[in-house]
């Protein structure tokens, strides 16, 4: 008798994706982040669902309802902080996952990579709208500043912003629709993640060497299930420590002040995971130029497969490219730091240099480095 997991219509999909899936024998812990992102998404949907049971998306009561969740709901504080810090863990895993893809040349799987970039955009949109919901000072002013950027679009900009706001300023209509979108988007993200996996399983996983691994495959279960569980335990421990010891470490104290349209906070800044893009936005003195740079800073990931000039797929055997990659990582850390600083000398200049360098490394320096390495292979 054939095993039920190989014959049952639903079970065989699970079987071919998570049990009998042929996986390269040499994939390192950098390949754990896909499963960690899945765990993050499930955790965010579940905690978000329980928060939505007690939250009210009305400007008069939103802030109070979040306070009520933290004070009066059983373990409401835990659910709220798991959700808020879970978003930070989500982005840490996302950035590491994308970084792994860049380093090991996983972007050569075009469909998987492009859907991944779409996923990144969708998660960023979800996180932005979620930040608005508590209706604190930073929620309100963050929403005002970021949505206002759309007014830079020629001709239709102003109408577009007022259409998104549902009025002439960020108000009740804006909060209600942001709540609706924040609720539905994670399910769209989950569906996209399914398509992401579908395309990945068409080709099979890449591996650190970047070479074809068809001759040396092992089943996903038990080898990588146990490895993923270890990764999950480490992530859950980190998240638990963050939530239970310093839940507000990554948040902004201004968000504990109820939204006041008559009082602007001294420094408007988004959550830490958007600071690199915010720094790029601020480094261009022109509004439309800034918005374009902001979008392109993420959209540039789409054209990375076109910029691959190396003869080897992975950076594992390309020391010069490795140096450029780590300089890019350092540049992103610099941008993140600058995004959280006030707009004054020397931060403005550092931000402008780091922004130029970011695009220069990706568009010019890395492809040229790869070409030089190709020549060195002949020696």
Swiss-Prot record:
Signal peptide: none annotated. This is Cytochrome b. Pfam families: Cytochrom_B_C (PF00032), Cytochrome_B (PF00033). It is found in: Mitochondrion inner membrane. Its cofactor is heme b. Belongs to the cytochrome b family. The chain crosses the membrane at residues 33-53, 77-98, 113-133, 178-198, 226-246, 288-308, 320-340, 347-367. CDD domains: cytochrome_b_C, Cytochrome_b_N. Binds 2 heme b groups non-covalently. Disulfide bonds: none annotated. GO terms for biological process: mitochondrial electron transport, ubiquinol to cytochrome c. Heme b b562 binds at residues 83, 182. It comes from Crocidura shantungensis (Korean shrew).
């Amino acid at each position: 008798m054939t095993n039920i997991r190989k014959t049952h219509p639903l079970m065989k999909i699970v079987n071919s994706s998570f049990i009998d899936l042929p996986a390269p024998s040499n994939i390192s812990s950098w390949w754990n982040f896909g499963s960690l992102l899945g765990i993050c998404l499930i955790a965010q949907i579940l905690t978000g669902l329980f928060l939505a049971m007690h939250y009210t998306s009305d400007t008069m009561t939103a802030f109070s309802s979040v306070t009520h969740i933290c004070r009066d709901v059983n373990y409401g504080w835990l659910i709220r902080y798991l959700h808020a810090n879970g978003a930070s863990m989500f982005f840490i895993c996302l950035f590491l996952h994308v970084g792994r893809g860049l380093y090991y040349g996983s972007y050569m799987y075009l469909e998987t990579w492009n859907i991944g970039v779409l996923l990144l955009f969708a998660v960023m949109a979800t996180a932005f709208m979620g930040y608005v919901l508590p209706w604190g000072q930073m929620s309100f002013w963050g929403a005002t500043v970021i949505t206002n950027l759309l007014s830079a679009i020629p001709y239709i900009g102003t109408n577009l912003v007022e259409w998104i706001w549902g009025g002439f300023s960020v108000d009740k209509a804006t909060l209600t629709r942001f709540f609706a979108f924040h609720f539905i988007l994670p399910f769209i993200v989950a569906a996209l993640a399914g398509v992401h996996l579908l395309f990945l399983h068409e080709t099979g996983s890449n591996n650190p060497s970047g070479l074809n691994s068809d001759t040396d495959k092992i089943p996903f279960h038990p080898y990588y299930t146990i490895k993923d569980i270890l990764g999950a335990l480490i992530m859950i421990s980190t998240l638990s420590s963050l939530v239970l010891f310093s839940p507000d470490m990554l948040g902004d104290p201004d968000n504990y002040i109820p939204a006041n349209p008559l009082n602007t906070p001294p420094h408007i800044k988004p959550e830490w995971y958007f600071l690199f893009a915010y720094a790029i936005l601020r480094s261009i003195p022109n509004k439309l130029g800034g918005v374009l740079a902001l979008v392109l800073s993420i959209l540039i990931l789409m054209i990375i497969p076109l910029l691959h000039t190396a003869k080897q797929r992975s950076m594992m055997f390309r020391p010069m490219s490795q140096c450029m990659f780590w300089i890019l990582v350092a540049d992103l850390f610099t941008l993140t730091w600058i995004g959280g600083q006030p707009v004054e000398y020397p931060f403005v200049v550092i931000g402008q240099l780091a922004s130029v360098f970011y695009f220069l490394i990706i568009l010019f320096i890395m492809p040229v480095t790869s070409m030089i390495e190709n020549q060195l292979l002949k020696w």
